[in-house]
Amino acid sequence: GGVLEEYGRDLTRLAAQGAFDPFVGREAELRRMLQVLARREENNPLLVGESGTGRTALVEALASKIASGEVPEMLADRRIITLDAGELVAGARLRGPLEERMRAVLDAVRDSGGRVILFLPNLANFLRTKGGAGDMLANALSHGEVRALARCTPDELREIHDDASALSRRFVSIQIDPPTSEEALAILQGIKPRFEEAHGVSISEPALESAVKFARRYV
């Protein structure tokens, strides 16, 4: 509870409540995330990919695996908390209040005894909040006081390397490519029952195949 709930979302709790679609495919990337998180050092995965490649779905899948106990023992009681830069900055135009919020968040993570892993869906935005909050986050990560999962695009990764090389060394990049046509079809098949139930419709296999084909062509 407390400050982490105020500025973040507990993905592990949401997963336990069945908030996320079933996860299909991407086993190699998920395994790689688990391997990185299980390390003693260099244990902060950075999911690098363009928007829409499924990076957030991977983090939700990880939260689901933690919630259902399908992870190595050292990750069994972890909580993944999404920390959004926009939520943190909202209403804190002055530098002082923003720094206080970041300090409170980082203190709460430290006080969790390693149980909380922050998910930073917009890492580059955090690092752009210079002069305090961004630097505090960078320092906490650089000293290994806080664990994090993060997400960025290839362009943002280059920016992070240029502007914060010490911080970028704390992250292990995992490339997330768009799903293949076969993977995309499997993903749609996985979420089809939920859509059918929610909208009271029946979705045929040819409709799914057409959706994949047209997405490849136009999206």
Outline where the language-model segments fall.
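Walker A/P-loop nucleotide-binding motif
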Residues: A28, R39-A61
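Short regulatory helix/loop adjacent to the ATP-binding pocket of P-loop NTPases
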Residues: K130-G131, A140, P154-R170
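Pre-Walker A (Motif I) flank of P-loop NTPase domains
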Residues: A19-F20, L30-M33, R39-P45, G114
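Conserved C-terminal "switch" segment of AAA+ ATPases
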Residues: P72-E73, E159-D162, A166, S173-V219
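Post-Walker A helix-loop "phosphate-sensing" segment adjacent to the P-loop in P-loop NTPases
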Residues: A63-A76, L88-V89
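Loop/turn-to-beta-strand initiation segments
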Residues: N43, R78-I80, D111-L118, S142-A150, ...
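N-terminal pre-P-loop "Q-motif" helix
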Residues: G2-E6, D21-M33
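Short glycine-rich substrate-engagement loop in P-loop NTPases that contacts/grips substrate
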Residues: I81-R110
